[in-house]
């Protein structure tokens, strides 16, 4: 989960200042709304020409706490912030290329019919694919040196809505004819999955001199991996329009996978898994549910993995205070008075989230996100401590605490790299904070996507893993929501004992695991938000064991 350093509305008060929330908010908003007032335009299109004052009055159905919070927000927003309507996320400049090795037309795939076991004809794959095309480029491994394996890159095109999602596929280093396929998703919302590729689990990393450094613990050691930049306008992806909620992005991902496996049936017969971290705790339940909803599909989905995710905010936000105040296994970051303030803020935060859960309205969900993020994330950020790793300070404010993100961006902005991958945009950025704010102001942040998990558990196994040094999506909250989830196997899961996780023939454990039915939770020691980066060997171990079915219900 990425928090914009430029907007206090996301809880990102300046780490360099200990001033009060209101003073910081006024300063940040005054500086930023002149150049990016589109980031906080009214969330509903029908109110695009109104001011905060007028659209507030239109929603008498809001509860008193939500109304009060909108009043507070209005005091912080400059009067000219809504002078004219603008798009949330600015379209990226892009130039279409013609040098593709394959173009798969969704309309052609949609026309394919097969005869079922009952003798009746039905479409080979379900879903609406007519408007989608998939473009594929064979990447020459020798040009970039990221890996020696077979690679493909390209775009999924939604021609009707002018959306173009970039992907990069790496074949397994081991046995690609039989090894599973994994889709990897980073979060944000609005952050490129190429971060996961080069910072965490891909075949190579990028050093300070922009050199490619091989990763011996890459997740494609025993699986083929697809890295996807989504939603649109993230990383190398682009559009003239915007995606502002998780559900809309799910249709795109289903189309991409369907067309990819149609073009490459040699990978379609293998087991397929979706893995991701952070805001992918929102994405993955929706994407998996979308795939499973299609009876006729060529996607052999076998499990999902969510690492340090945001999935059930009502339960998870309760655990920011314990994690920041010394109850998560690491020393306290906040003072006793700050911890008491967080305790005092919890009832209001939970009331706002419950109202969001019940109504689903942006007018309830936006205040919940704004209030709770400022009360529970803001105080921590003001200390200068890394929100993604409680063990140290933020080393680079301009690159989400990690200088390596800047190196990755510089590498991916090189012309020879973009040409080798068939990139159509003018440049790359690791995170698009317009998208981040867009999702916030569409009410997506606090939505109860955990409610989809019981339905997924009926079909396939689910793994929740969490590095225990992360603050932003900490292990306490992830363990708590997995135990609070209402599903038929709840009692058995909660009674299951935590067992040691360790490498084969190793005496030292690297975490704990509990599993029952199709549900598994892991706590990974000495790892922050990005577990594969901090514990590369251990993360590859539990990945391979998970893909091998060690904790699957028999």
Swiss-Prot record:
Q: Which Gene3D superfamilies match?
A: 1.10.287.410, alpha/beta hydrolase
Check the UniProt entry and state the signal peptide residues, or none.
1-17
- Keyword Transport, does the record have it? no
Glycosylated residue positions: 222, 518
Please state the Enzyme Commission number of this protein: 3.4.16.5
Q: Name one Pfam family in it.
A: Carbpep_Y_N
Location comes to: Vacuole
- Which residues pair up as cystines? 191-431, 325-339, 349-372, 356-365, 394-401
What UniProt keywords apply to this chain's record, in alphabetical order? Carboxypeptidase, Disulfide bond, Glycoprotein, Hydrolase, Protease, Signal, Vacuole, Zymogen
| Entry's Gene Ontology BP terms | proteolysis
Please name the top-level EC class of this enzyme.
hydrolase
Q: Which GO terms describe its cellular component?
A: fungal-type vacuole
Task: Mark which residues the record calls propeptide.
Answer: 18-137
Provide the catalytic activity annotation: Release of a C-terminal amino acid with broad specificity
Q: Where is the active site?
A: 278, 470, 529
Keyword hit for Metal-binding: no
GO MF terms listed in the record are: serine-type carboxypeptidase activity
Q: Which family does it belong to?
A: Belongs to the peptidase S10 family.
Its function, per the record, reads: Vacuolar carboxypeptidase involved in degradation of small peptides. Digests preferentially peptides containing an aliphatic or hydrophobic residue in P1' position, as well as methionine, leucine or phenylalanine in P1 position of ester substrate.
Q: What protein does this entry describe?
A: Carboxypeptidase Y homolog A
Gene symbol? cpyA
